[in-house]
């Protein structure tokens, strides 16, 4: 299955993503512990606007922008599936960035890296499904799922990743 994923994306796309990420000054990106899965299903606001985070199974060290990236994935999926317009997704993302910057620094390069980091996240997540087949993904991880997910990742990559050819 891993070979299929690599062939589906083509080594050229993977190389382009790696090259693009290497074009950033990654040593200047903020680094620390990341949740790595800040999708709406993994946090809750109570009636006093307190937030609770849960589902820490992907927790690890990395670039802090990865947490913003996972929320960006949520917005980009909603825009791609027409659950919201691209303008609404961009507006929501800009609110997140503005609010985040009120608390900590976030560079333009970190923001620009998000679509490429999301590609890496999708590859990781597909690997997660493979590695945890017996205890997690066996009910849905089949050929149809893989084909649909690969096509989705291709669509998102084509839409949001801008490679200098």
Q: Can you say where each PLM-predicted feature lies in the sequence?
A:
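An alpha-helical support segment within catalytic cores of ATP-dependent transferases
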Residues: 1-36, 46
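Protein kinase-like catalytic core scaffold
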Residues: 32, 52-54
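Conserved catalytic-loop position in the HRD/HxD motif
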Residues: 37, 55
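Activation segment
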Residues: 46, 51, 59-61
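ATP/Mg2+ or Mg2+-diphosphate-binding catalytic cores
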Residues: 125-165
